[in-house]
């Protein structure tokens, strides 16, 4: 199920992203080329998948979440462009291709990331992509701004940069990853639910529990793959976190215990969906996929 669902959602979000990434003037061709390169060069599209699945959990057509799906993928892509810069993680490979600052240059990569961040909010406010009432679109903008900013993803990256060579306990490690990785994953689910225009507060609360567990599980599995996989499969440098002496779940818990923890988080996510019917099956499948994926 998950492969067909993933392919369908990837095609949908890519089609919605395409018009946003067209240069409006000849003078902006290189900037937009860097932006397109950063977004349209593959990727699992996990965050759009979660947005679409959360929308569908309420029986609402997935297309209602096109704006949400585009927005979270654009924010994710911008974060990768900036994370890969020499001043940050200094990576030269992403999704099996040279990172944006290697394919273009550092200044262009910085501007491309800035542009992608701005486009995310354009997508949420575009009535063609986000046909919801103004009050819902405002709530969606607030959700994404909170998740992407210093109280969310950006704050998590700041903590991450300050954690190199530092031995964090599990509570501190999870605080970092709930911000760096988890905040945008939680926002993806919430944005999809808001896009449905049918979610009540109790359902939003249940989905937050689901998304928080899935967000941590995603990071635990990433850390496991950094140990067990290879560069060709991952599309990025294998062992990079170990080489930089970054805190990881396998380093803290041991590999077997990290795998067990990922399974516990998956089960927590599935339990949070107990009040949802079969429309939430894609969310259930995604929770399983996130801890079973090999890249």
Give the predicted meaning of each segment.
Residues 21, 25-271, 281-291:
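Mg2+-dependent prenyl diphosphate-binding active-site environment of isoprenoid biosynthetic enzymes
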């Amino acid at each position: 199920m998950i492969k067909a669902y993933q392919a369908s959602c990837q095609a949908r979000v890519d089609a919605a992203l395409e018009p946003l990434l067209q240069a409006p003037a000849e003078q902006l061709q290189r900037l937009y080329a860097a932006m397109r390169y950063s977004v349209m060069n593959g990727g699992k599209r996990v965050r759009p998948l979660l947005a679409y699945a959360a929308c569908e959990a309420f029986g609402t057509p997935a297309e209602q979440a096109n704006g949400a799906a585009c927005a979270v993928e654009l924010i994710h892509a911008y974060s990768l462009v900036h994370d890969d810069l020499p001043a940050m993680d200094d990576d030269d490979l992403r999704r099996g291709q040279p990172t944006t600052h290697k394919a273009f240059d550092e200044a262009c990569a910085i501007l491309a990331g800035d542009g992608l961040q701005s486009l995310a909010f354009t997508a949420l406010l575009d009535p063609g992509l986000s046909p919801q009432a103004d009050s819902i679109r405002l709530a969606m903008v607030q959700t994404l701004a909170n998740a992407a900013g210093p109280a969310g993803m950006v704050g998590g990256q700041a903590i991450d940069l300050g954690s190199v060579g530092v031995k964090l306990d599990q509570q501190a490690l999870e605080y970092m990853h709930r911000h760096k990785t988890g905040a945008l994953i939680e926002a993806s689910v919430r944005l999809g639910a808001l896009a449905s225009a049918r979610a009540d507060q109790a359902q939003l609360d249940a989905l937050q529990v689901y998304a928080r567990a899935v967000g941590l599980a995603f990071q635990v599995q990433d850390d496991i793959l950094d140990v067990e996989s290879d560069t060709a499969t991952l599309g990025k440098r294998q062992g990079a976190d170990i080489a930089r002496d970054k805190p990881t779940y396998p380093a803290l818990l041991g590999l077997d215990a990290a795998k067990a923890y990922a399974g516990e988080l998956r089960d927590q996510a599935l339990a949070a969906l107990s009040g949802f019917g079969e429309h939430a099956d894609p969310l259930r499948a995604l929770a399983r996929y996130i801890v079973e994926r090999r890249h």
